[in-house]
Every structure is written in C-alpha cells, then in structure tokens.
C-alpha cells in the first residue's frame, strides 16, 4: 500500500512519510533508484505480472507495484556503483528481454517526496530509448538526458527551423536527379 500511495502522490510531506515508516515498522533508506517496466503486447497485464514475479528475488531492498499498466520497482539502500548495480541491470535486462518488454531506470535520488520527478525519468528513458535505440530493452535515464530535454522542443518546431539550408539544397538536388543523400555527400 505504501508504494501505491507514494507513486500516486498521496504522501506529500515528511510528516506523512514518517507516519508511514512508523506504521510499517521499518524505514526505507536512501539512496533510491526507480525502475519502470512496460510491456507492449497483447497480454500486457499478464506480462507485467510475470515480470513482477521474476523481479521479486532480484534485490533484497525493493518495493514492487503495477500502477497504470507500468511495473515500478523502488530499490532502496541502492548501491551507486559496483557489481550489485551491474548485476541488477544485467538480470533485469534478461527478464525484460524474455517478455519483450522495456525498462527505464532513473538516476539515484535521496528524497522519496520527489519520486514523481524520478517516475518521469524512468518513463522518459523508455520513450527516448525506443526512439533512439529501438532494440534496447534497458534504458538508463542518464544516457537519455539530452534527448529528454531536446525532443519535446524539436517535435514542436517546423523542420526548417533546425535543418541547415545546405541539407535542404542537397535533398532538392537528390529529388531532381533521383540520387540518394549519402552518395551525394
């Protein structure tokens, strides 16, 4: 229930967070990493349930929830470096490949009240990972920070605002002469 309330934005301040920790009789300590997993196939819910089951033994310090057709894994006491992080990423990659799913991993963070920002990071990692590297199954947000910043702006701009005039001229030449851009260059 805690992870559901946290991801839904119902825990808004330190007092509420501490009350949850008291009620659960545990404290979920930083650093944190949030992972999102999406499956885009006909049996999406079944795939996410199977992925959830497979991921439950990956890490000792994690909370898992399927929320709005996305599987979220909150890893707490997360290692910032080293073999355990690499092993987690490697194991997760194998799992998502098996189910033809995609996963995005946020940057490390230390404040659970800012989880919404990191939720966006995970979903952006998946979105821009699919655009820039369609075969990737595991996308780290840190690898897609620049596209996450630039793509929304480029999508709103007319092509001639960012396309150099020289490329327009080459495209026109190629159309007139039935040639291709690469050989023309």
Predicted features along the sequence, with ranges:
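Cytosolic nucleotide-utilizing catalytic cores of signal-transduction proteins
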Residues: 1-185
């Amino acid at each position: 229930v805690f992870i559901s309330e946290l991801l839904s934005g119902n825990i808004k301040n330190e007092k509420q967070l501490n009350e949850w920790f008291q009620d659960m009789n545990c404290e979920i300590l930083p650093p944190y990493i949030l992972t999102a997993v999406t499956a885009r196939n006909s049996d999406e819910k079944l795939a996410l349930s199977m992925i959830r089951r497979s991921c439950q033994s990956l890490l000792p310090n994690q909370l898992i929830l399927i929320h709005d057709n996305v599987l979220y894994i909150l890893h707490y006491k997360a290692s910032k470096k080293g073999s355990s992080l690499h092993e987690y990423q490697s194991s997760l990659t194998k799992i998502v490949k098996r189910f033809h799913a995609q996963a995005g991993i946020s940057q490390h963070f230390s404040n659970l009240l800012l989880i919404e920002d990191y939720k966006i990071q995970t979903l952006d990692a998946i979105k821009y990972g699919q655009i820039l590297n369609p075969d990737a199954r595991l996308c780290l947000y840190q690898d897609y920070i620049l596209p996450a910043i630039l793509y929304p702006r480029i999508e709103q701009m007319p092509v001639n605002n960012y396309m150099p005039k020289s490329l327009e001229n080459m495209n026109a030449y190629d159309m007139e002469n039935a040639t291709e851009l690469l050989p023309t260059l």
